[in-house]
Amino acid sequence: MPIYNFSAGPAVLPQPVITQIQAELPSFRDSGMSILEISHRSDLFAQVLQDAEQDLRDLMAIPDNYHVLFFQGGGTLQFTAAPLNLAPHHRIGLLDSGHWAQRAADEAKRVGTKVTILGSSAANHFNQLPTVVQPIDQSLDYIHLTTNNTIEGTMMTRLPVTGQVPLVADMSSNFLGEPYQVSDFGLIFAGAQKNLGPAGLTIVIVRDDLIGQVANLPSMLDYQLFAAKDSMFNTPPVFAIYAAGLVLKWLKAQGGLSTMTARNHAKAALLYDFLDQSQLFTNPVKTSDRSTMNVPFVTGQADLDAAVIQGAREHGLLNLKGHRLVGGMRASLYNAMPLAGVQALVDYLAAFEAHHR
């Protein structure tokens, strides 16, 4: 029986990547040393780091005036790093699209930043994206948004018009799964553990003219320092960068982001089409704002939801339990999830519904 992992993160990885890791783990590139034990100062790792950055630049068409930095601490650490580095006047705007946007606001406030909510969909239970209040104050240091809301199941493809105010994007859950123009943003960050690799790595893409505005920052949060040190200020997450590098090469071999985006839209359409015609399952998200990465759905009865999850597990469909804040079910359809996995889920849900009419 095939196993399909619908976890929201850490999440499914491409099988060829796992196979390659398994083969190379005892001796990386015939060095006699595992990737788990090589020095981060070695030529072996220098090549891994260089390749990962270049492959990411190729896939996303990252302009030369943007730095690519490799951090630890998850996307959550960037909720603090972004205002420390990019908000010299301690004033930012934020689009409140759900849990992770609110977490970003809370962390910014902890470091003395005033956060102005420019739009919120809280009144709609975050089942749609917020409408931006215009005009936007041009004295704001930046505007924070979340491109994909993992818990609520919404995704932003149309960006707000912000004038000269830079956009800062938390792309953690649709990074490399939906195409964006990097030059539309001042800063992009993303935890790797959804679409890029195992947990332990965070990607930061930041425009050169925005760093160095604030002096005497904590070293581990200083974008300018990390840029100057090529992300090697301290020991980086060697294995996580190596694994992410393999995923990037896999993405290129698949045809890049255009191919992956088409696949992701096809997978999401398959599941949404079933949910929309179902008499048992519902998805609460406004159709135009639906995520291609994270699809929440419910039966409306907690005991029936539990039965769905248990039965799915018995059919090799794992980690469908919804986030603890919203309950129900959630299917995460990241890049490495094959169409066959989504078809298996739809077939199971259809059979479950037929049995429980």
Curated annotation (Swiss-Prot):
Q: What is known about its subunit structure?
A: Homodimer.
GO biological processes: L-serine biosynthetic process; pyridoxine biosynthetic process
Where does it localize?
Cytoplasm
Query: Which residues does pyridoxal 5'-phosphate bind?
Result: G75, T76, W100, T150, D170, Q193, N234, T235
What's the short name of a Pfam family annotated to this entry?
Answer: Aminotran_5
Q: Which residues cross the membrane?
A: none
Gene3D superfamilies xrefs = Aspartate Aminotransferase, domain 1 (3.90.1150.10), Type I PLP-dependent aspartate aminotransferase-like (Major domain) (3.40.640.10)
Family annotation (NCBIfam families)? PRK05355.1 (NF003764), serC_1 (TIGR01364)
What cofactor requirement does the entry state? pyridoxal 5'-phosphate
Q: Which domain of life is it from?
A: Bacteria
Is the keyword Lipid biosynthesis in the record? no
Q: Which PANTHER family match?
A: PHOSPHOSERINE AMINOTRANSFERASE
- Family statement drawn from the similarity comment of this UniProt entry: Belongs to the class-V pyridoxal-phosphate-dependent aminotransferase family. SerC subfamily.
> Which pathway does the protein contribute to?
Amino-acid biosynthesis; L-serine biosynthesis; L-serine from 3-phospho-D-glycerate: step 2/3
Which organism is the protein's source?
Lactiplantibacillus plantarum (strain ATCC BAA-793 / NCIMB 8826 / WCFS1) (Lactobacillus plantarum)
> What's the protein name?
Phosphoserine aminotransferase
Record's catalysed reaction(s): O-phospho-L-serine + 2-oxoglutarate = 3-phosphooxypyruvate + L-glutamate; 4-(phosphooxy)-L-threonine + 2-oxoglutarate = (R)-3-hydroxy-2-oxo-4-phosphooxybutanoate + L-glutamate
Q: Where does L-glutamate bind?
A: R41
PTM sites of type N6-(pyridoxal phosphate)lysine: K194
Per the UniProt entry, the Enzyme Commission number(s) are 2.6.1.52
Gene Ontology CC entries for this record:
cytoplasm
Gene Ontology MF terms: O-phospho-L-serine:2-oxoglutarate aminotransferase activity; pyridoxal phosphate binding
